[in-house]
């Protein structure tokens, strides 16, 4: 499967770490949109990312924002996922195409 590069954004910190051969930890994002209530969801997501940093790696929370796959999120993007009004879809591999094509927001899951 290939993806149009316009629909994939790798956070600069994640990209730089990968280029240097550093440690990156991929994190699903459903805990933010579907796992915990707002505003605790965004707080817990930030704590998890900090725990990854404390362990010597860079966190790469993965989500779809406005039809673009994001690998590594900004604080504003975490907040979009955590906002109940953002209409975030729970996304597994079977849902990628429709969510991307519709330009929606999606939270990734490993299921």
Question: What feature does the model see in each segment?
Answer:
Residues 1-21:
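N- or domain-start disorder-to-order transition segments that initiate the globular core
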Residues 11-14, 84-85, 110-111:
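Short, charged beta->alpha transition segments
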Residues 21-23, 58:
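A generic secondary-structure signal marking the coil-to-beta-strand transition
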Residues 23-37, 109-111:
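Conserved phosphate/anionic-ligand binding catalytic regions in large, soluble enzymes, centered on
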Residues 29, 34-36, 42-99:
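Glycine-rich nucleotide/cofactor/substrate-binding loop typically near the N-terminus or early
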Residues 98-111:
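Glycine-rich anion/phosphate-binding loop at the beta-strand->alpha-helix junction
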């Amino acid at each position: 499967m290939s993806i149009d590069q316009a629909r994939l954004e790798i956070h600069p910190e994640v990209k730089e770490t990968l280029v240097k051969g550093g440690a990156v930890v991929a994190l699903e994002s459903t805990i933010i949109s579907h796992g915990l209530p707002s505003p605790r969801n965004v707080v817990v997501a930030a704590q998890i990312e900090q725990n990854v940093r404390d362990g010597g790696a860079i966190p790469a929370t993965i989500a779809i924002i406005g039809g673009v796959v994001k690998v590594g999120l900004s604080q504003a993007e975490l907040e979009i996922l955590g906002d109940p009004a953002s209409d975030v879809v729970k996304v597994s591999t079977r849902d990628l195409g429709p969510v991307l094509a519709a330009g929606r927001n999606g939270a990734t899951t490993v299921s």
